[in-house]
UniProtKB/Swiss-Prot annotation:
Organism: Rhodococcus opacus (strain B4)
GO MF terms, alphabetically ordered: ATP binding; DNA binding; lysine-tRNA ligase activity; magnesium ion binding; phosphatidylglycerol lysyltransferase activity; tRNA binding
Keyword Nucleotide-binding: yes
Predominant location: membrane
Protein name per Swiss-Prot or TrEMBL: Lysylphosphatidylglycerol biosynthesis bifunctional protein LysX
Transmembrane regions listed in the UniProt entry: 38-58, 77-97, 101-121, 126-146, 164-184, 219-239
Zinc recorded as keyword: no
Segments of the chain annotated as binding DNA: 674-751
Amino acid sequence: MSASTETHHASEAAVPTAPRPRPALGSKSGRLHQVPHIAGLILGVFSVLVFLWSISPVLRYYVHVPREYIDTYYFDAPDTSLSWALVVALLAAALASRKRIAWWLLTIYLVLILITNVIVSITDRNVNAMVAAVVQVVLIGILVAARPEFYTRVRRGAGWKALGVLIVGLAIGTLVGWGLVELFPGTLPQGERFLWALNRVTALAAADNEQFSGRPHGFVNTLLGLFGAMALLAAVITLFRAQRSHNALTGNDESALRGLLLQYGADDSLGYFATRRDKAVVFAPSGKAAITYRVELGVCLASGDPIGDPEAWPHAIEAWQTLASQYGWATAVMGASETGATAYNKAGLTVLQLGDEAILRTREFNLSGRDMRQVRQAVTRVRRQGVTVRIRRHRDVPPEEMAEAIRLADAWRDTETERGFSMALGRLGDRLDGDCLLVEAIAEDGEIDGILSLVPWGPTGVSLDLMRRKPTSPNGVVELMVSELATTSDQFGITKVSLNFAVFRSVFEEGSRIGAGPILRIWRSILVFFSRWWQLEALYRSNVKYQPEWVPRFLCFDDNRELLRVGFASAVAEGFVTLPRFGRSGTHDAIEHTGHHAAVPAALVAAEGLHSDGSAPGEGLAPTATGPKRPEQVRVRLDKLTGLAEQGIDPYPVAYPPSHTVTEAVESPEGTTVRIAGRLLRIRDYGGVVFAVVRDWSGDIQVLVDEARVGTDRIRAFAAEFDLGDLVEVAGVIGYSRRGALSLLANEWRMTGKCLHPLPDKWKGLSDPETRVRQRYVDLAINTDARRLLEARSAVVKSLRDSLGGRGFLEVETPILQQVHGGANAAPFLTHINAYNLDLYLRIAPELYLKRLCVAGMEKVFEIGRVFRNEGVDFKHNPEFTILEAYEAHSDYEKMMVLCRELIQTAAVAAYGREIIMRPGPDGTLVEVDISGEWPVKTMHQAVAEKLGVDVSPETPLAELQRLCDEHEIPYQSTWDAGAVAQEMYEHLVEDYTEFPTFYTNFPTSMSPLTRPHPTIPGVAAKWDLVAWGVELGTAYSELTDPVDQRNRLTEQSMLAAGGDEEAMELDEDFLQALEHAMPPTGGLGMGVDRVVMLITGGSIRETLAFPLAKPRQ
């Protein structure tokens, strides 16, 4: 993935953190802690002064007296020496970075000057030398006392090579300088000209001018100093480059990284770029996580998230920070994801959003639609010119074709060197990168017009590494390659593609909008200006046209004061700023293993089967997922499972059907041969006899294994082989124990399923309600009450279906995925269909489709099915539930009232044999309640009036209703009409306190958008709600069949939805068009099946569902 990287703009606020604790080096407090910074500052200022007077004769003239005084007694200060200015600057930087070697150099240098001053003060009785000696004694004392503060080390480098470069450079500089002195000797005698050049170039002007008989022209001294500075700079760069190579990846390092990527590479799209070979790496002590980095300008720059187990990330980060502290580097991270940035932030780093990464979800990618018009037109235009696309894995590309692709990629590159660090691999055609994808645009004549190379992102993703196009290729080649990759991704198992990284995306996007503030527009203009060189805007534009998902990426750094240096170091690392290089190209380091010392813990090299060539650990040796931590009892059962396999016993055999259920076996006469199967719930071993309890869905039976019947070896095997919870199959005859208990006298048995987890307490079962929901299968296996509830539910649903079928109703199924949410006032769930690139809702009610069938002529129709409402979860609400809706032509809501009551009473008979329901009594036990006969019927306003003790009717003014609400502390919204306020009063005063099933009728018309108005009472609808024990069980309407009135009401609802009301219905034009074909007068009924089961069984909604929704484990 190619990307530009810079520090972020001012509108992106940093996340402040407490300073990160460094290793316990130095005092960390007191005045001595500041000595390195003060020493570095003083020498830094001095080096600038030396540089300035070396190039300025005017300044040199004005500072002549103090310069000579300092040069004589305190510190060398030659009149012109750029090389000495460079030396002092390097020493200042090293001191500020707390380098121990810089402390030694400065201390030894000051001691030598001190010795000189002492000798002069004694021999010449020079007061100035004596004063300088005292000052130097104080300075040396301070340095000695502050020695622990200079704790950072210098990386090992190619010292001899750097020394050779220095000697050669100085020799050349001296010879060239000698020639200059000969050309422009000034007053310098012939015999002193070579020594003058040698002193100025090589000896850093150590010899004073007074020791020579004359001097050359002034500009010659400046050039001679420049020659020395250039030689010294070349040596320093050689040393630094050697240090970088010395700490680059080794083969074992890369092998370990690839092993970690095999396990954890699916999370970070930049993970594979960690195998770039011109990076160094540091591992967590366990080897389970690692961080790759590069040091630029004293900044230890990590890239992306740590690689490996997220639980080991903090240890890897700590190791990385410790390493940086040892060498005095500032720490920074480029391109961290939100998860990685959180981990770095916890370690003390400050976080800034750097930009956004463009992610294409291939299953959602489609060229249709207005937003994709630009890409679609480009693709069509290029295809008309005969351009096709070829996609292959790198391992499938013949060597000669890969070599040609590499040649073209280099030829089409618009920069001298390959850019990229955190989001680029830096190599192409390596044998270890066989899983990478090569996408080529092939012109009609067979020539290659464009190339994309993408690296793996876990098993199902790829991340863009390289993008090239032929300068003369038609516009749209890149769009064709990207779209073809997305649309044919199924062939390669690809579901996501990471494209370019857009720095400052929010600035480009928001700064171009109408109404953007002046600061944002100015900032965008600045970025557009710099985009002429760094392609900041081009990267954003090239990505946004694909309508990607934008995923933020972050810059993490140690200290706000280091932000400028971090930004510059990032630009150097990414290739936007090129520093001078000598010798072999840096690109070579990214292709080959140039590291000499492996960073991976040595103990892991052999233990993990790492390969020195960088390939992933061998099959069977690669680190494997450890899985969940197993309790001891589970580990014991796993060991037993292994033991059974070693004995040739299949713990999960093929089926052999039992001859009887447990209940059938219990009811069989004594002596009957039976074979039963079930779960082993209890085992009691008495030596010569073993008793066990086996349960299937029908009931329990005692199994008796007698030593006299089966022998000693087999009875011991039974006791040793089985654990509680195992599924077993037992054959034998029905008989009795010595105490007369009915038992299955076992002759044969076998395991049909080994249970790896112990069952809960045999008496208490699962006592925690959340555990009962999460492990519903265990609860049903051991809890007979839970089983009875499911059996009752099955009986209720079957009764409802049979009752309606017996009345001539036809059962149908209507769509669950709907384009418009309607049929009820509720918040919907939203989903997306990739085939049509279309947002859909999970239905909140089947009503509108069932009414279409009524228009079609189905006079009696019903559906029992699942609906989904994005609402709260409590004892009577679940996000998905089962609903019954039935419609009968030439009927009304009063006839639906009779139908509803009879359906529930018949369902109660199916569950218990009588028209009764079970309700919790005062002590919590279930008691029977008779629900036979007629049920109470009240109007909604009548029920509210009874609760308030005042008259309330449909004509009651809104102000009076609001006053009553205030008086009884009932909340309402000021925008509600009288109907909405009255219904809110009903829900608070009536519904919550209703116990015996009661029908409440005549609800406000404004709250019933799909209901026919009451034929005689204005302001109310022909509707009722059935309520029992505070729960609404069902509702019924005289359906609204007037299409004009229905359109007006749904239009009002759609306006509420547009205003932000999530529960308001949307306008369903297809339904309205169907209604305009005429629908007969119809009565409609809706019942919550789950709530009917709750009513009949006395359980909560969770207890009546096989698998209620539960929060995920934290």
